[in-house]
């Protein structure tokens, strides 16, 4: 059933937006420069910084700490128009809640990265190493997939004894080839131009999403039909990224031994939507509790 749905969505989008695919099929990336070390890091929290949950604030602080030469640009509902313009039909559907904030943010990241370049990072990324994607025109987090009992498994390079189900199985459009929550590239890049155009076109024609991961489906469609887009994605090296492992161990008691295996990993994708315990059963801080009290791992 998953395979049929996956293929049906791609087939529908391909038929509906074949003109866009054709338009971009001859795009080249030869003129694209490498990611500018002074380009912005884009962070969005729609409700504003003051309304971030505490764990998100910790993640945001670590991003700023490791931003290096990249200026950090904070985007919220109150200021996004300063940086990005959208067609009236998009704004109207956002105001009517036809387009959710989550799906609007997908268009926002494509818009910002196309207009300015830089790095889009979800506000829930705990960052432990300096951010630098020099010497490449495009970057995203990707992992080698190891199939295990039908589930795609991502294993850390250099870290033994850790394995966790990768959140995209083999029928997902991303299949570990990219991560929408961390994308980086150059101003005017064809990949972001395409993403913006097809998402605008989709929401002009529709009042609901064909699937929650519509964003990944549009990237998959481009990957399959636009050679230069495929090249950009394929040229990104596999990252050290058991990116969800820390999240599922937040209630583990904090100790240097228990966190040592996470420290070599630059990015950990966390969530504010789950309830974690600040203290273990013996009263000692959990990893979650340590993060809140020390603002870092």
Where are the regions that the model predicts?
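Active-site acidic Asp-centered loop
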Residues: 116, 121-123
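Small-residue hinge/turn detector
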Residues: 106-116
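Glycosyltransferase-associated regions of secretory-pathway enzymes
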Residues: 1-105, 123-297
């Amino acid at each position: 059933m998953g395979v049929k749905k996956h293929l049906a969505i791609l087939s529908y989008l391909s038929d509906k937006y074949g003109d866009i695919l054709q338009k971009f099929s001859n795009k080249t990336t030869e003129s694209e420069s490498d990611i500018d070390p002074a380009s912005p890091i884009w962070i969005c929290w729609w409700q504003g910084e003051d309304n971030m949950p505490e764990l998100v604030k910790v993640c945001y602080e670590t991003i700023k700490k490791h931003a290096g030469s990249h200026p950090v640009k904070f985007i919220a509902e109150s200021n996004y128009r300063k940086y990005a313009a959208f067609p009236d039909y998009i704004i109207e559907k956002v105001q009517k809640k036809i387009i959710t904030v989550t799906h609007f943010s997908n268009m926002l990241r494509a818009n910002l990265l196309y207009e300015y370049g830089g790095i889009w990072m979800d506000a829930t990324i705990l960052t432990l190493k300096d951010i630098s994607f020099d010497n490449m025109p495009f970057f995203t987090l990707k992992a080698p997939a190891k199939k295990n009992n039908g589930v795609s498994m991502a294993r850390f390079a250099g870290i033994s004894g850790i394995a966790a189900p990768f959140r995209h199985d083999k029928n997902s459009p991303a299949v570990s080839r990219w991560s929408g929550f961390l994308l980086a590239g150059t101003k005017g890049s064809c990949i972001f131009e395409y993403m913006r155009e097809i998402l605008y076109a989709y929401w002009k024609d529709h009042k609901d999403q064909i699937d929650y991961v519509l964003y990944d489906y549009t990237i998959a469609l481009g990957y399959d039909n636009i050679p230069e887009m495929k090249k950009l994605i394929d040229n990104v090296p596999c990252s050290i990224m058991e990116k969800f492992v820390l999240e599922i161990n937040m209630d583990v008691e904090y100790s240097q031994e228990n966190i040592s295996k996470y420290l070599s990993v630059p990015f950990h994708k966390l969530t504010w939507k789950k309830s974690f315990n600040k203290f273990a059963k013996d009263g000692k801080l959990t990893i979650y509790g340590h993060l809140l009290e020390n603002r870092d791992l």
